[in-house]
From Swiss-Prot:
GO cellular component labels: cytoplasm
The keyword Endoplasmic reticulum belongs to this UniProt entry's keyword annotation: no
Region (Involved in Mg(2+) ion dislocation from EF-Tu): 80-83
Function of the molecule: Associates with the EF-Tu.GDP complex and induces the exchange of GDP to GTP. It remains bound to the aminoacyl-tRNA.EF-Tu.GTP complex up to the GTP hydrolysis stage on the ribosome.
Protein's cellular compartments: Cytoplasm
InterPro entries listed in its UniProt record: EF-Ts_dimer_sf, Transl_elong_EFTs/EF1B, Transl_elong_EFTs/EF1B_dimer, Transl_elong_Ts_CS, UBA-like_sf
Domain of life according to the entry: Bacteria
The protein, known as: Elongation factor Ts
Keyword Cytoplasm among UniProt keywords: yes
Length: 294
């Protein structure tokens, strides 16, 4: 059995950042081989990271970056808001955005398999970050957009990455207009670009609801149709970007504002951290008891 010295433990701690007892155990298990001990700790770290993966990651941040031809918006999740504000986490998000912008994978599964500049796969890069940061982290989603020459990307990040928006305008290269539209989308959260994009099924469903509302209000049948028509028009304008009053100048619509620059909104992506994720609510008593039993 190798003689494990305090200096060896100290050196391993400095190289890995692991705890003293973990380092000592790693050296004992690998008979004092420093490189094997590092591998041992990495393997244990990965095992720990895998164990953390059943925890809900509903915090995090969005990020938007672009180059001359392409842009990406993505969401990376963590478990707590505290970690989301951590410099290491923010650097990770930026690195993932740059990787996706460079490689432009077709799917999340493909993205996780791509190779980072340091030779690691994206999945391994994230797993290593989980070990260092101590929380479950996941690349949740991303979208990549491509633009032509006479087009503009608009990028807007709200509340330190809580909301990220990417817009694509055609017919103009005015990035200020594109960014203004992105800011509007962050604030108002439209569902569609124009009312023409709303499906017939959704329109008919809303019409049925509004008709029933009007009838329940006791309105005469002869004016119900006109009421429904007016309310439906209002509903469509509320969910359609081009029809919405522009946040920076409510006297004009977003469509009118964009048209002033000769442009047209052709797409937008709005990511809000954690939307659609059900947060796990632990029972406080159970949480305390689980800590006592450890």
């Amino acid at each position: 059995m190798a003689n494990i010295t305090a200096q060896m433990v100290k050196e391993l701690r400095e190289k890995t950042g692991a705890g003293m007892m973990d380092c000592k155990k790693a050296l004992v298990e690998t008979e004092g081989d420093m490189e094997k001990a590092i591998d041992y700790l990495r393997e244990k770290g990965i095992a720990k990271a895998a164990k953390k993966s059943d925890r809900v990651a509903s915090e995090g941040m969005t990020h938007v970056i672009s180059n001359e031809k392409h842009a990406v918006v993505l969401e990376v999740n963590a478990e707590t808001d505290f970690v989301a504000k951590n410099d290491n986490f923010q650097q990770l998000v930026d690195a993932l955005a740059k990787q996706i912008l460079e490689v432009r994978p077709d799917s999340l599964e493909d993205a996780l398999k791509t190779e980072m500049p340091n030779g690691q796969t994206v999945q391994d890069y994230i797993t290593e970050a989980i070990t260092k940061i101590g929380e479950n982290i996941s690349l949740r989603r991303f979208e990549v957009k491509e633009k032509a020459d006479n087009s503009a990307f608009g990028e807007y990040i709200h509340m330190n990455g809580r909301i990220g928006v990417l817009t694509l305008l055609e017919g103009t290269t005015d990035t200020t207009v594109a960014k203004d539209v992105a800011m509007h989308i962050a604030a108002i959260n439209p569902k569609y670009i124009s009312r023409e994009d709303v499906s017939t099924e959704e329109v008919e469903h809303e019409k049925e609801v509004l008709t029933q509302q009007a009838l329940n209000e006791g309105k005469p049948a002869n004016i119900v149709e006109k009421m429904v028509e007016g309310r439906l028009k209002k509903y469509l304008s509320e969910i359609s970007l081009e029809d919405q009053p522009f946040v920076k100048n409510p006297d004009i619509t977003v469509g009118e504002y964009v048209k002033q620059s000769g442009g047209k909104v052709v797409s937008f992506v709005r990511f809000e951290v954690g939307e659609g994720i059900e947060k796990k609510e632990d029972n406080f008593v159970e949480e305390v008891m689980s800590q006592v039993k450890k």
